[in-house]
From Swiss-Prot:
Description of how the protein assembles with itself and partners: Homodimer.
Active site (record annotation): K74
Residues bound to shikimate: S23, L24, S25, T70, N95, D111, Y223
The UniProt record lists the keyword Amino-acid biosynthesis: yes
This protein's GO CC annotations: cytosol
Matching InterPro entries: Aminoacid_DH-like_N_sf, NAD(P)-bd_dom_sf, SDH_C, Shikimate_DH, Shikimate_DH-bd_N, Shikimate_DH_fam, Shikm_DH/Glu-tRNA_Rdtase
Protein family: Belongs to the shikimate dehydrogenase family.
Name the UniProt record assigns to this protein: Shikimate dehydrogenase (NADP(+))
Positions bound to NADP(+): G135, S136, G137, G138, A139, N158, R159, T160, I161, S162, K163, I221, G247
GO biological process entries: amino acid biosynthetic process; aromatic amino acid family biosynthetic process; chorismate biosynthetic process; shikimate metabolic process
One Gene Ontology molecular-function label: NADP binding
Species per Swiss-Prot/TrEMBL record: Buchnera aphidicola subsp. Cinara cedri (strain Cc)
Swiss-Prot/TrEMBL catalytic activity: shikimate + NADP(+) = 3-dehydroshikimate + NADPH + H(+)
Associated pathway: Metabolic intermediate biosynthesis; chorismate biosynthesis; chorismate from D-erythrose 4-phosphate and phosphoenolpyruvate: step 4/7
């Protein structure tokens, strides 16, 4: 039986980003729609920097109910929302938008809780974990706060040091976060997270290869299809890591929390991770 609160008409949800042709989000939300018995469609829109704002605003003006934002527009979408949650105000990064009953566009971010869910599922993270994050873009802004809430000690490695410094200065009041430097080349990190978009273009980010040990947990927030490793994870495996995972679990978890924001129903995350793995 369809959820009576949303049975009047089909609900329009969307994904905005670039690139998007690889995205599994439409498939995930198709499964969610069946599970929670709410009839919503989920369409993808390829955007450019010049038309992103226009396309998203047109979507909401023409009956759009909610949307996800992916790379490279998570920081830009902060400028679209006219109301934001506390965490979004901290991170200045949005991956979920929802139109409220009084026509406000409210910004949320589910990347951080999605990542923590998956790192807990994999048993990768504990309080006080030493974590190296590769990258300093919108995806990193989305996840750092939740890692600091776990009392993790974070180091940021990015090819542009000034961007790392800006990020660190923004979040240092919430916990231990530092810019990676050459004095850490022999440091043993508990987790190394690739939060760059390099995998979308089929290459691994550059990082000191001597940081990989057999027990180093390597995590890529990107994911790959057909059970192939992402370029980053392939590199880590070849360097000797025995523990590595892509971000498929994070993707499903953040999507489920997005669904909860839109419809106040949380799909079964574990079941949908297993379902997706069996399909792709």
């Amino acid at each position: 039986m369809q959820n009576s609160k949303y049975c009047e008409k089909k609900i329009h949800i969307a994904l905005f980003g670039n690139p998007i042709e690889h995205s599994l989000s439409p498939l995930i939300h198709k499964n969610f729609s069946k599970e929670i018995k709410i009839n919503y469609n989920y369409n993808s829109f390829l955007c450019t920097k010049s038309n992103f704002f226009v396309i998203v605003k047109n979507f909401f003006q023409n009956g759009g109910f909610g949307c996800n934002i992916t790379v490279p527009f998570k920081k830009k979408s902060f400028q679209i929302s006219n109301k934001n949650t506390k965490y979004v105000k901290i991170s200045n990064s949005v991956n979920v938008l929802k139109k409220s009953s009084n026509n406000n566009i409210i910004g949320y971010n589910t990347d951080g809780i999605g990542l923590i869910y998956d790192l807990n599922r994999l048993k990768y993270i504990t309080e006080n974990s030493f974590i190296l994050i590769l990258g300093s873009g919108g995806a990193v802004y989305s996840i750092v706060y939740h890692l600091l809430k776990k009392k993790c000690c974070i180091f940021i490695l990015n090819r542009t040091i000034s961007k790392s410094c800006i990020l660190v200065n923004k979040f240092k009041k919430f916990g231990k976060i530092f810019v990676f430097d050459k004095n850490l080349y022999t440091k043993k990190f508990d987790i190394i997270i690739n939060a760059t978009s390099c995998g979308l273009y089929n290459f691994s980010p550059k990082f000191p290869k001597n940081l990989i040990f057999p027990n180093t947990k390597c995590y890529d927030i990107s994911y790959s299809k057909n059970k192939k490793l992402t370029p980053f994870l392939s590199t880590c495996r070849d360097l000797g890591s025995r523990k590595y995972s892509d971000g498929l679990g994070m993707l499903v978890a953040q999507a489920a929390y997005s669904c909860y924001i839109w419809f106040n129903i949380l799909p079964n995350i574990k079941k949908n991770i297993n379902l997706l793995k069996s399909i792709i």
